[in-house]
Amino acid sequence: GIWYWRFRQADTHGTTQGEWSEPYHFEVPDETPVFVTPAFSEFQSRMPHSYPRLHCYLDPKIETARLNVKSHREYKMLTGRAQDALNTNYTTMNPNENTGTLCIHTQSLYDAWHLTQDDKYSDCMYRLLRQMLAYPISDALLFASNFASTDIAICYARIYDQLYNRLTPDERAAIEKLMMRVLRWYYPQHCGTQENHIFDNHFWQQNMRVIFQCALLLYDNTVYADEVLPMLEYYYELWTARAPASGFN
């Protein structure tokens, strides 16, 4: 049938602010497939509490994949990309200022270590982190653009996720603060905007995913849980509201 939709703002206590928008309408044909996305409470009950967790959906098959990884046709490409990172000398530069390359290298090292468990990849990630942390990130650099923010955030997030049990408390805290800077900057901007925006290319191409991943890493952190869990719920509900129409892509 024909559905009508309008919106207005409300604060965190549910107190409405401002007037209703003009009504919108759309039609749902009878032949439209029915799909009900899981409630956030169900998603939350299944969220992991251990690290690494960014690719927790692979956990049931990861051991089998590791046994067979060397026979996979893409194994040489996997290790070749990681070797590029191993061969790069970051000791004379600020890695945070070259996020294009840094993103590729942290992704390649993450994937290679996750599948091979070869410590040369995790050791390289750790050395890279030490160099990254040696250069404090200014707001001017971190928020130069929304892609710049999430490029930097995901580099730190991958290392945090993969090396969590190896990092010192100070190293963990430094990465957590960086991720929280990004979450606190963008979450207020997204609320009330993205759910009423037809399509924001940057948001759906990368930014939403990275921000969601940062929230997933911190949702059960004793320092940030109360602040981060509502953020995670917001992005989950926003994604599931849009996902069926876009094929979950």
List each model region and its residues.
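Helix N-cap and loop-to-helix transition residues
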Residues: S21, Y57-L58, T168-P169
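Alpha-helical interaction segments
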Residues: G1, T15-T16, A65, G80, ...
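Aromatic-lined, polymer-binding surfaces characteristic
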Residues: Y75-T79, Q83, N87-N249
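Low-complexity, Pro/Ser/Thr- and charge-rich linker/hinge segments at domain boundaries
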Residues: E27-L54
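Extracellular fibronectin type III
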Residues: A10-P33
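Conserved small-residue-rich
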Residues: M47-L86
